[in-house]
Curated annotation (Swiss-Prot):
Protein name, as recorded: RNA-binding protein RMD9, mitochondrial
Region (Disordered): 38-68
Localization (cell): Mitochondrion inner membrane
UniProt keyword list: Membrane, Mitochondrion, Mitochondrion inner membrane, Phosphoprotein, Sporulation, Transit peptide
């Protein structure tokens, strides 16, 4: 069977003329256990004596000689072919381990890419998350095995990168469609998946640069685009520079293709490369293709670079060229959409940017525009930076909110509202009265465009702390009940954190803390998450640190400076002779003053609550972060750390908890 496979392999690759000759008069055979040899008949042996030949025999002999020359040349070809074929490693054999792994990889890639784009009859994406993420993980595991054995070609490696890139987009889409942002202070699936994809892409890029695996131009483009979407701009450039300066010409070729260079052009400009140098690179890369039309991806990169360099006329000229059939044939709609969005968010000429924005709203373009919220946010920021005209900002925000409609996901609306509300409070930071009136008008207007939701109020509650007004914070807190919006744990954290911007008694902070803990227990948390501890920290330690930086007085209370030896000496009467007659009254006044200080000492409150509730930490490592870690990062907390072990916190209230576990 093995010999038959070898023969079939050679027959499919050697010239037909030689195969035919080897079958006929010469009766030749291939020997695969040594160099290819040719067995001749005795009549063909030049050492054998031959009788005298007639003229016809001479002609026949001449033809045979010519045939022998052809055969000899073909024999040499087969020998060369033999040297380049590893007959002991036929990967296409069904019995080969590599064959089964390659098939498994192909199945995973096909299954993953299909799951990421499957749609229902109504056009909506089908939720096949578990199948998709399983395919991503399995593909990466098989990739590692094939890299070790050297059985992975550039096509399959590129498809693995493509799947990783698609996974980033799927992860991002799932995040923006969530009703609330994930708790990044505790563990979340999307956070873990982002880290996993990032590390996987780094592993693949390392394999490419180390010549362990090769990729096509498409794989290189997906790789760099992935790092760029992860906001790892410096790493994106470093990978590209290392690739184009590689000694491996195949790597250089892959990373110099137009659609790859288009990814890095804007980054090169942002990192100091001159516009003229980028134009030269653009022209060089544009010529590096045999396609009849240019690369839309390269042009998109050049347009973004032109906009960043304020070369708006050049950008418009390229866009017009992209839209014409003469210049680029039928351009991919995705690239046209990306170019349109680039003009909205990245063009510093506000007239041009707003023109593209209005065209996107009107939906009368020959290509479909999915108005990305990131582009709208960039436009709003550019308007504010250049004009400081808040009315223009309101106009764009209002139009975008109406465009997205009432059913848009909280992720998209929250992203837009966060940018808008930040600019709002920046505009009214010193004019609280006018700002409060305008804020009420905006809340009413938003309720008419899209019903008031929890994320919208959360954003306002977070940003309004710049006014440092307790009445405003309490008024916004009441709005949740006014609009019949249930408070999630995120809201309780924001409320507690807001206490760090105003002056309130410690009892108020304790009350907000207990409410937060009760909510955490209610939703099934089994330990106090990092985000909960962070809210307490900001309400207490961060507040005190800011007061200290701003010149406020700060000193430890009596309980903070407790000295057992000194207390024992006082109790024994050792210092009675040194007391003045009126010392009793003064001592009482001193104690009252210290008691008031203790009631308002937020750092003391922080460590008391930490010690009382620390048993509900996730693990000792978390407890160390919220005790010694805080003292390490906050100067005002350092004197308190040594007092934690001696604190009596038995009187601090802990509500009944059903789900919390004693972990520490």
């Amino acid at each position: 069977m093995f010999r038959l496979v070898q023969q079939q392999t050679l027959k499919s690759r050697v010239p037909n003329q030689f195969v035919s000759a080897s079958r006929n008069s010469l009766n030749s055979q291939f020997r695969f256990n040594s160099a290819v040899a040719l067995e001749r008949n005795p009549q063909q042996d030049p050492t054998t004596a031959a009788p005298a030949k007639s003229s016809s025999d001479k002609r026949n002999s001449k033809k045979k000689y010519e045939n022998n020359e052809i055969i000899e040349r073909n024999v040499k070809k087969v020998r060369n072919l033999r040297r380049n074929i590893k007959f002991d490693n036929f990967k296409n054999s069904p019995n080969s381990p590599a064959f089964s792994k390659l098939n498994a990889l192909d199945d995973c890639l096909a299954r993953g890419l299909e799951a990421s784009s499957s749609r229902a009859p109504d056009g909506k994406f089908l939720d096949q998350s578990s199948l998709f993420w399983d395919s991503v993980s399995s593909s990466m595991n098989i990739y590692r095995e094939l890299v070790i054995t050297g059985d992975l070609n550039n096509h399959r490696a590129s498809r693995v990168i493509q799947l990783m890139h698609v996974a980033l987009k799927v992860n991002r889409t799932q995040l923006t469609s969530m009703n609330k942002k994930p708790d990044y202070d505790s563990q979340s699936f999307h956070k873990e998946m982002t880290n996993y994809l990032c590390e996987s892409l780094r592993e693949i890029s390392g394999d490419i640069l180390a010549n362990r695996v090769s990729v096509s131009e498409h794989g290189a483009a997906h790789l760099l685009s992935s790092f760029k979407e992860l906001l790892l701009y410096e790493e994106t450039l470093n990978i590209w520079k290392a690739a184009v300066n590689s000694e491996n010409k195949d790597i250089v070729k892959s990373f110099m293709f137009p659609n790859v260079v288009g990814v890095v052009l804007p980054l090169l400009y942002e990192n100091g490369t001159t516009f003229e140098e980028i134009k030269k690179l653009y022209e060089k890369s544009a010529s590096n293709t045999t396609r009849s039309h240019g690369s839309p991806s390269l042009v998109l990169g050049m347009i973004k670079t032109s906009l960043a360099a304020n070369e708006n006329e050049h950008a418009l000229s390229l866009f017009q060229e992209m839209c014409t059939s003469e210049g680029f044939g039928v351009s991919p709609y995705a690239v046209l959409t990306g170019t349109h969005l680039a003009f909205i968010g990245e063009c510093k000429d506000l007239y041009v940017a707003k023109s593209f924005f209005e065209r996107a709203l009107s939906k009368d373009m020959p290509y479909k525009i999915n108005l990305q919220v990131s582009s709208v946010k960039q436009l709003i920021q550019n308007i504010w930076d250049q004009t400081h005209d808040f009315n223009e900002v309101v106009d764009v925000w209002t139009k975008a909110t109406k465009y997205y409609g009432k059913d848009v996901s909280h992720g998209i609306s929250s992203s837009l509202n966060s940018k808008f509300i930040s600019i709002f409070f920046e505009n009214y930071v010193t004019d609280k009265a006018a700002g409060l009136q305008h804020l009420q008008e905006l809340v009413t207007a938003y309720d008419e465009m899209k019903a008031i939701d929890e994320p919208f109020l959360n954003i306002i509650l977070t940003k309004c702390t710049v006014w440092q007004d307790r009445n405003i914070i309490e008024s916004i807190e009441k709005s949740y009940e006014l609009y019949h919006i249930p408070k999630t744990i995120v809201t309780y954290r924001i409320i507690l954190k807001a206490m760090g911007s105003i002056s309130v008694p410690n009892d108020v902070i304790r009350e907000k803390w207990v409410q937060l803990i009760q909510k955490a227990d209610q939703i099934g948390q089994t330990y106090i998450a990092n985000a909960d501890w962070a809210a307490l920290r900001d309400a207490t330690v961060t507040y005190t640190q800011e007061q200290f930086k701003n010149g406020g007085s700060y000193e430890m209370t009596t309980s903070d400076s407790y000295n057992p030896a000194l207390e024992a000496a006082n109790a024994s009467g050792a210092f009675d002779d040194f007391n003045e007659p009126t010392s009793g009254t003064k001592h009482a006044d001193h104690l009252n003053t210290q008691t008031n200080k203790e009631d308002n000492d937020r750092i003391l409150l922080y460590y008391q609550l930490v010690k009382r509730y620390g048993v509900y930490c996730r693990d000792p490592k978390q407890y160390a972060r919220i005790t010694s870690g805080i003292a390490l990062n906050f100067e005002v907390a350092q004197p308190y750390l040594g007092l934690v072990n001696t604190m009596d916190v038995s009187s601090i209230y802990v509500p009944p908890l059903r789900n919390f576990h004693l972990n520490h």
